[in-house]
Structures are given as structure tokens and as C-alpha cells.
Amino acid sequence: MLAPLPPCALEIRGLVKRFERPAVDGLDLAVRAGEFYALLGPNGAGKTTTLRMIAGLTRPDAGAIHVAGIDALADPVAAKRVMAWISDEPMIYDKLTPREYLEFVAGLWGVVPALAQMRAQELLDWLDLAAHADERCEGFSKGMRQKVALAGALVHDPQLIILDEPFTGLDAASARLIKDMLRQRVQAGCSVVMTTHILDVAERMADRIGVMAEGVLIAEGTLDELRRLEGSGHATLEDTFLALVAKSAVE
């Protein structure tokens, strides 16, 4: 007998968002608990718009979004309590130290002070920020700011992490720390949905990959499944991705 599938951390049905043209057009997508899902596509494919709708930053024109079983459109506050959003431009409070920022964010989510302090210290240690925990963030590099932003996103122990191009502009050491943290969270049962143009990162980290083009999900599966779909055998993700997008444009 097959083992039951883990529950859905994220379920999207019929998602639509229009600007001058449809940015997202009838998207269906599901991500299981403990799954790392990479959402890929060329510029303008609708990836960031999709993530912003999941995170509650952009309102869809139609469709449904459920996060850990919560209707994110009907009860966005409850949905945000179980997810984290991290953009490619880290937004933190420059006049606070990392420790102050983490405890402040934890307080916003209702984490009791003692637990907030414990989680903050764990994250500072894990992300190699402990030596700078009591320095103001205003002088930090982008890599350090991105680590502070990630720590702030994780301090309330979310079930779903949404990342939009998290490795853009990071040095190798910072990128490695963040990748290690994400792997640890997935192993603990958390789910990750990530967009990236760095395809070798998606190839190494993702359990499943979705490919978008012109607001539509044109392919989805493991790397081997995408290879079979495209007929490319043992091609890299980059080769497979480019072939799928080109085929979609012709069709």
C-alpha cells in the first residue's frame, strides 16, 4: 500500500491577476508539507505576482489560495501567521540591531518574550550573525541584511516560506548559509516556494519545479519528469527550462 501524501501547505486554484494584460491566468498549484518547490520562468512570466498574491501583498481578481488549510483571501491575518515572505530587496529597520529587530517581529506575531529571545538567539547563531547581534543594521552589507530579513521571517516558526529571488547579489558564503537554513527548515517539515533565475540552485535544492510563461504554468514535476516531458534525457535544468519555454512560445 502506498503511503499517504503529506497535507498541502499551499493550494492555489484558478488564480487570476490582470494588469494591462493577464499577469497570472488561471493558475493551479499545490505544494506539500516538507516540500521545496521552485517556480521558474522568464521575466514577465507572472512568478513574482503569484508570490505576492500568496503573501497577501496583491489581491487576485479571481481564484482561491489556501495556506495550511486556511483561506488566505477570507482570513489573510491567520494565513500570514503561518507563512513568511522574503523579497529580493530585504526590508528591515536600519536603526534596530538584529537582536532588537527579531524580538520586535516576534512580538508582532504574539510570540511570548522568553520564546522570542530564545528563537532570536538560535537564528543569530545559525546565520552567523551573533557577532553583530547588537550592532545597528544600517551599516550592513546586502548579504547580512538578507540574513537578518530571513531570520525575521522565521522567528515565528512559519509552516510556509515564500522567497522571491533570495540569492540575487549575495556572496557565496551568505548564499550557502541561507541555503543550509532552508534545507534544515524543509527537513523539519516546513515548505518552501522560491523563484530564482539561478537555475543550478533550483536544480540542486528543489523537490519539484514549476515553469511559468505568460501567466500560465506550462510544466511541473521533478527534474527527471521535466526532462521526460521535454524529451531531453539527461539535460541540465537550464537546457530543459529553455526548451520548455521555447516550445510554449511556438504553441
What are these regions (language model features)?
Residues 157:
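Conserved catalytic motifs of ABC-family nucleotide-binding domains
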